[in-house]
Amino acid sequence: MAGNSIGQIFRVTTFGESHGVALGCIVDGVPPGLWLCENDLQIDLNRRRPGMSPYTSSRRESDQIRILSGIFEGKTTGSSIGLLIENKDARPQDYQSIKDLFRPGHADYTYQKKYGIRDYRGGGRASARETAMRVAAGAIAKKYLFEHFSIEIQGYLSQIGTICCEFKEKECIEANPFFCPDPHKVEEIAELICALKERGDSIGAKITIMAKNLPVGLGEPVFDRLDADLAHALMSINAVKGLEVGEGFSFVNKLGSESRDEMTSSGFSTNYSGGILGGISSGQPLLVHLALKPTSSIAIPAKTINQQGETVEMTTSGRHDPCVGIRAVPIAESMLAIVLMDHLLRHRAQCGHF
């Protein structure tokens, strides 16, 4: 399995499985001299971790991060930073009864066909549990981007099912378990999630991530355009099935005369392109929307096949999120931060300035 790393200069390599001993990652390319402690990473990990509310997975993981290397006297040294999280609430026995079945909508079938072997315990490497290490690495990038360039990254739930959440109050995002920016929609979302849990079903979602105060110049045309690398990184998040930058698919219904982000001496008049032009950051706020499919592991029986190719009916037990889009918010923020950090260092290496 060769696809465990992302980035060229700021490079993140993760390892570990959902119900294995631990999760870990190596972060290369962190500039020396950055004040960094475990709590800097723990804040975002707590936003992602399961068991934090009755609306997400009941798996109770503390996700306590350990920094194993790359820090001396509280500062980064420029060497590889090793990070580790032990799995404390793994329950592989939950999957014993379905180990010979391919859960519909999961990676079980494709992993088995590709590798001839798979870790059936919660999907193993294919589980979203792996993303804990992306969040830890992303927290390092976020800290550097903010402290050195005042770049702010914010994500939020913009739609769940038919409930649309407008960006009304930034403070509201962290004040509810759904990362919802509209205080008037929180109760409605809670009722939806409770109804889904009662029925044993799940729902899809759309999340939005933003970056403010970006300099002009991030992105390496033609194949490493900023939006191309963002698509690569964000589409690697479990359950993400769609992505749009700025107006995205809405451009289909627009005229060129009304959507070209005209400029004046005062700056851009609009930001339909979401802060990226020609694959390079324009200095405007970067705006990306992600669509996530509903959780496939639900209590409603479904048809599938076993390893012998026979049609069977199965019900998935275990501890699963009724909407994976909720906990995907800090994951998407982290992947955005990782890509921006890598492109910032690449730009500085080639051009030497902003």
UniProtKB/Swiss-Prot annotation:
Q: Where does NADP(+) bind?
A: 48
User: Which UniProt key words apply to this protein?
Assistant: Amino-acid biosynthesis, Aromatic amino acid biosynthesis, FAD, Flavoprotein, FMN, Lyase, NADP
Q: SUPFAM superfamilies of this UniProt entry? A: Chorismate synthase, AroC (SSF103263)
| Binding residue positions for FMN | 125-127, 238-239, 278, 293-297, 319
What is the main EC category here? lyase
| Pfam family membership, one | Chorismate_synt
Assembly with partners or alone: Homotetramer.
Give the protein's recorded name: Chorismate synthase
